[in-house]
C-alpha cells in the first residue's frame, strides 16, 4: 500500500478507537444513582459548585400509586435534562435546582403529571385531591456532571 493509504487507515483506526473510548466513558462511568421518596425535597446539586447546566440524567423514572392502589410509572429523563439545560444561558447559573421551583414542594403523586391519571381534569375536586394525600411516590435514576 502507498504511504497516503497507510496514513488514512491509521487515522481512521485511531478515530474509531477514540469514539469507542468516548462512548464507554459517557455511558458507563461517572453516573451516580439517586432515589427520592414521597415527602423528600428533590434537590440536585453539583458536587463542585459548577453550573447545574452541565448535569445530565439517565434512566429517570417517576413511580406513584393512585388512590385505587394502581401503580403508574413515567420516564422523566428528558424533563430533568431539559430543566438542567435551561440554566445554560443564565447570567449566573446556579449549582443546584429544586424540583418544584421556589416552592420546594416535597415529592408527591403530582410532582410529574400523567395525563388521564393525576392531571387537573381527572383530579377535579378537593375531595379527589385528598384521596391522593397518602399515595406513594418515588423518583429514581442516574445523574452525572459532563
Swiss-Prot record:
Membrane-traversing stretches: 7-27
Keyword Oxidoreductase among record annotations: no
Keywords: Host membrane, Membrane, Transmembrane, Transmembrane helix, Virion
Keyword NAD among UniProt keywords: no
GO cellular component: host cell membrane; membrane; virion component
Membrane topology: Single-pass membrane protein
Location in the cell: Host membrane; Virion
Induction section of the entry: Expressed in the late phase of the viral replicative cycle.
Family to which this protein belongs: Belongs to the asfivirus E146L family.
Protein known as: Uncharacterized protein E146L
Organism the protein comes from: African swine fever virus (isolate Pig/Kenya/KEN-50/1950)
